[in-house]
């Protein structure tokens, strides 16, 4: 595992070094005021960010002077390989003013860096431009919905995304792309998630130094796996802290699978998008790693939600719905009212309009929860609340048997070497189940766990009906890039 982690960490470091040493290229400066009378040959001035982007090609820089910019910005494949950098994280602001649209979208453009700026208040609509299509503040879009990888190389640092309304979709978002990193980022107030990585079976990605708060989900990652590292970050005051998940159809192809060496699937068949992984032992190489994070007080039922996040079980630090081969290690997981880690099998979609036709039954297999510190989780009380809840056996439910639910492969999940201060399910989980059991516990023949999860959904709905979600507060200033001229060719801003 150390070698795997080293590879992923080194990849993230490479991205930072490359960004810091951009070398030559044209410098396109965005200034709302008048340009100086004399400028170097390699420098051009523009009044809008979009105009500066349009004039850029691979190796060029877009430097943005402080100001509030009321525009949507789109980067296309013609601008692959450019840098977009604000000169002050807190004073360079792309402002959506609560209108429907996307803030900064990088569409099928590879190797694009975005750094040191703020994007805020872009919304999704009730009709027309819906969630996922709009309401995304910073979006590396490799071809959303295509089920294919459409771009490579997405890099962001010193970024702030926030929404003070109730219809912001995603803060910092990538799908259908591989090979990227985010460092020193912040997101709050989003009805889906603060950060999202999706639709990459082999993501080759790293997130570090993130602060995610006041979102429906701090992190969400549908069908994202392989080499994927979430580390050294804070997830607090969300409805749910971290939720990697399998999903169908969604950001396909499914499932979410953290086992090393999982290929990106091209042209999956409609009836079997990606075969269910068969996990034969607890001793498998895991490359999707959630480590060294603080995951605390994810109990915020005033945060905005959408149709998907509004039905998620609330109050957990980490949720693993239908996940395979993820490693949760060396985190502090504290003060989450339902469960520190909540892991369960996941039929999805759960209640389609045409019965269960088209449903995929995602198992829970090969995951490991080790060396974490759990403190004061489960304050809601009741069965299944506490530090860790591990539930399988849904195939034993009579309804699912009648509908052809497959034999359970929810095996070889492992819980070891954690510090617990609360209850676990099963009780004393490391002694009774731990890493020595091939199967996953099935409380009450599976029905009891389903009742618990559905009960949390109903509970959240009831609370929201009495006290509807509200816009979350704007954040305080965040740390700006120490030297925004680092690596930039000489120009009037960087002499």
Q: What feature does the model see in each segment?
A:
Residues 85-91, 110-121, 149-165, 170, ...:
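Right-handed parallel beta-helix
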Residues 37-38, 125-135, 139-149, 249-284, ...:
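Intrinsically disordered, low-complexity Ser/Thr- and acidic-rich flexible linkers and loops
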Residues 69-74, 95-103, 123-131, 135-137, ...:
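Short glycine/acidic-rich loop motifs that flank beta-strands on beta-rich extracellular proteins
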Residues 50, 54-57, 68-85, 93-116, ...:
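Extracellular beta-strand-rich solenoid/capping regions of secreted or surface-exposed proteins
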Residues 2-13:
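Bacterial N-terminal signal peptides
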Residues 353, 362, 377-495:
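Acidic, glycine- and Ser/Thr-rich low-complexity intrinsically disordered tracts
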């Amino acid at each position: 595992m150390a070698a795997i982690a080293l590879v992923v960490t080194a990849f993230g470091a490479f991205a930072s070094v490359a960004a810091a040493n951009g070398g030559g290229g044209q410098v396109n400066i965005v200034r709302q005021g008048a340009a100086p009378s004399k400028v170097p040959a390699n420098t051009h001035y523009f009044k809008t960010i979009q105009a500066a982007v349009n004039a850029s090609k691979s190796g060029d820089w877009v430097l943005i002077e402080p100001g509030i910019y009321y525009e949507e910005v789109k980067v296309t494949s013609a601008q692959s390989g450019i840098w977009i950098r604000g000169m002050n994280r807190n004073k360079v602001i792309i402002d959506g003013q609560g209108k429907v649209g996307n803030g900064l979208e990088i569409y099928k453009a590879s190797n694009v860096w975005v750094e040191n700026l703020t994007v805020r208040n872009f919304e999704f609509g009730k009709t027309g431009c819906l969630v996922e299509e709009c309401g995304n503040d910073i979006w590396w879009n490799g071809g959303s919905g295509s089920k294919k990888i459409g771009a490579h190389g997405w890099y962001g640092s010193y970024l702030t995304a926030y929404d003070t309304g109730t219809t912001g979709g995603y803060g910092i978002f990538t799908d259908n792309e591989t090979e990227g990193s985010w460092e020193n980022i912040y997101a709050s107030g989003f009805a889906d998630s603060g950060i999202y990585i999706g639709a990459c079976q082999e993501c080759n990605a790293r997130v570090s130094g993130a602060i995610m708060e006041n979102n429906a989900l701090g992190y969400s990652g549908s069908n994202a796996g392989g080499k994927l590292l979430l580390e050294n970050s804070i997830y607090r005051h969300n409805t749910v802290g971290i939720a990697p998940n399998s999903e169908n159809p969604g950001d396909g192809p499914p499932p979410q699978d953290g086992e090393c060496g999982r290929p990106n699937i091209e042209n999956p068949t409609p009836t079997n998008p990606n075969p269910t992984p068969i996990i034969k032992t607890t001793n498998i190489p895991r490359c999707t790693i959630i480590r060294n994070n603080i995951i605390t007080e994810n109990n915020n039922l005033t945060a905005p939600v959408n149709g998907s996040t509004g039905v998620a079980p609330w109050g957990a630090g980490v949720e693993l719905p239908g996940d395979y081969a993820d490693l949760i290690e060396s985190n502090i997981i504290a003060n989450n009212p339902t469960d520190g880690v909540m892991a369960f099998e996941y039929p999805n979609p759960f209640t389609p309009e045409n019965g269960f036709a088209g449903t995929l039954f995602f198992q829970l297999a090969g995951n490991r929860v080790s060396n974490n510190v759990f403190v004061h989780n489960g304050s809601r009380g009741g069965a299944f609340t506490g530090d860790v809840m591990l539930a399988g056996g849904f195939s034993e439910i009579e309804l699912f048997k009648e509908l052809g639910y497959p034999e359970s492969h929810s095996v070889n999940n492992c819980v070891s070497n954690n510090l617990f201060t609360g209850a676990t399910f099963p009780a004393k989980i490391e002694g009774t189940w731990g890493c020595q059991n091939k199967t996953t516990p099935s409380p009450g023949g599976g029905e009891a766990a389903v009742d618990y999860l559905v009960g949390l959904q109903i509970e959240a709905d009831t609370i929201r009906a009495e006290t509807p979600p509200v816009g979350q507060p704007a954040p305080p200033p965040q740390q700006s890039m120490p030297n925004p001229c680092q690596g930039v060719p000489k120009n009037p801003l960087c002499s």
